[in-house]
Amino acid sequence: ALAVENRRIALEKEQATVHAQNEQLRANLLRTISHDLRTPLTSISGNASNLLSNAETLDAETRTKICTDIFDDAQWLIGLVENLLSITRIEDGRMNLQISPQLMDEVVEETLRHISRKSKEHIITTTYSDEILLADMDARLIMQVIINLVDNAIKYTQKGSRINISAYAKNSNIVVDVSDDGPGIPEQNKAQVFEMFFTGQNQIADSHRSLGLGLALCRTILAAHKGTLTLRDNEPHGCIFSFELPKSEVSIHE
């Protein structure tokens, strides 16, 4: 009877700990969202008000600049909402993965067509090995992983810097590396970059776009695929985010 009671107490303590962690996560999320969303929303509202009030007096170049700013802020907000929904659904077990064999090089190319216009300020290249890069995945979610990794590289590197996406086979996995030649990540921050809400100190990054959900989401999505996400240095400077997915056992000819 004592052993049963001890197990009951231990289970209650564990449940209380999980509940406290969930409440802390919810509090962090609400606090961070309410703080960090204010700037882009204020920017959208201010720019839209300017257009409504001064449309007839603004020259074409100024109107285009204002519309571009509104578009960029709106796109960032859309991406944020998609990340939040994906994290919530996966961690609640409500995300039904639509797994099928996909060619990784085709997924990468499709992803690049969805990358925001900011990618035009960087040099993005791709490298694929000669073998068939077939992996089992939910292509929509893996595209979201690649978008987040590339957006992260864009955010933390100078305009005009290089970002390379390479895909290749390694043993029983398909590997994708997203590398940049930026300043890299300090050693003391490497263990934290995958934590939700963590944002590194970087003068290049846009300070109001710093929820720190992207890498946490990437790792969550890849864990649901039985895959991994790692970080290493890109010599002489920069970093490489690398993820692996199991190879598909389906033949490309089937």
Which residues are covered by each model-predicted region?
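Short beta-strand/loop element within the Bergerat-fold HATPase_c
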Residues: G160-S172
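Conserved catalytic submotifs in the C-terminal HATPase_c
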Residues: Q98-L103, T125-L133
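Short alpha-helical segment of the dimerization/phosphotransfer core of two-component systems
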Residues: D72-L77
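Short conserved segment of the HATPase_c
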Residues: I185-T199
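Short helix-loop "hinge" at the ATP-lid/N-box region of the Bergerat-fold HATPase_c
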Residues: A153-I154
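Short alpha-helical Gxxx[C/S/T] motif in the catalytic ATP-binding
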Residues: G214, C218
